[in-house]
Amino acid sequence: RAAQGQLWLPGAIASALAAGDEHAQTPALSEQLRLQGDHLARLHDFHGDHLGPRIARKHQAWLLESLTVQQAISAEDARAWRQTFNRLESAEAQVECLRKMTDALMSASPTTAPTIQIPSQLCPQMSVAA
């Protein structure tokens, strides 16, 4: 459970142990988001079009919680992204929403918890469940 939302954690711990370091290093935000994109694609491939998007929702929620703790995103923005992501029914829409979230986060100031466009402004053309 410690790795929920922190896909990079097992590898970082292994690297730290191999190097004799007492602290695992948190990767850059861009690397965390890249790993989430890979993970999302694999989830969809493994679980298929019906279960994949449903299972991906909790994984995305864990990522957003982790990013909130890291102060990479505000709790309010994380909540808005989660609500939007949870309404998406297709793998394609989820991947596109993650891409737009990644773009928004990467363009925000790295020194503060960013305030980014709310998902409905970024993903208006995506099909969402009513």
Show the residue positions of the predicted features.
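Alpha/beta catalytic cores of nucleotide-metabolism and tRNA/nucleoside-modifying enzymes
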Residues: R1-A130
